[in-house]
Amino acid sequence: MRGVLVTLAVLFLTGTQARSFWQHDEPQTPLDRIRDMVDVYLETVKASGKDAIAQFESSAVGKQLDLKLADNLDTLSAAAAKLREDMAPYYKEVREMWLKDTEALRAELTKDLEEVKEKIRPFLDQFSAKWTEELEQYRQRLTPVAQELKELTKQKVELMQAKLTPVAEEARDRLRGHVEELRKNLAPYSDELRQKLSQKLEEIREKGIPQASEYQAKVMEQLSNLREKMTPLVQEFRERLTPYAENLKNRLISFLDELQKSVA
């Protein structure tokens, strides 16, 4: 329980800013978040697209055109998956660069959090001991009440409720008092930790990771290299889709011509 209290207390002090430092997984980079959002969007479009295609192909116009959109959508999905697979090494390269450049900062923040955790440990131990003691006291007080519940008749329900209500209210008020006491004890360390985090963020804005000009040049170089490597992959992706796009266009033109003739 002590370990859980320590972790919850530090997260309470720092908010979500410090969450990744207490997890075994590596922190999610901006690139990770962008990739996840794109994947979710593509999956949503794919799912909704299949429903729309199924409705269209089952219609009279869809049957007449016989565009085989579902097959083409699967081909498009396969091509997109291959493009994503081909991009993976370059994405990994940029992500590793970001993690390397922020390693020193993350180490400093982890050290600050460890120091705060040690400072607040006595308060958490005290809170845990009081909480456990209170629960044990009320467990003992409720033991005879529980026995009465076994023999409870309908006529005694209100009487039993009258006995339980003040016990529950007292327990609630005393536990709230312990929580409030813990909050007051942790307040100075919360301010200290927030100040340190703000200071580190200010250092990033002023100095960069490492120096701003150096880091910017490195990022631009990486992006330029990435763009050069990605160009042939995107071109290949376009070439694979061209036949299906042309086929779709020709079928639509043919259908419109036939429709115009029938109207005329």
Curated annotation (Swiss-Prot):
Highest rank taxon of the organism: Eukaryota
Cellular localisation: Secreted
Entry keywords, A to Z: Cholesterol metabolism, HDL, Lipid metabolism, Lipid transport, Repeat, Secreted, Signal, Steroid metabolism, Sterol metabolism, Transport
Tissue spec. comment: Major protein of plasma HDL, also found in chylomicrons.
PANTHER family xrefs: APOLIPOPROTEIN, APOLIPOPROTEIN A-I
Function summary: Participates in the reverse transport of cholesterol from tissues to the liver for excretion by promoting cholesterol efflux from tissues and by acting as a cofactor for the lecithin cholesterol acyltransferase (LCAT).
Family the UniProt entry places it in: Belongs to the apolipoprotein A1/A4/E family.
Stated name of the protein: Apolipoprotein A-I
Gene source species: Gallus gallus (Chicken)
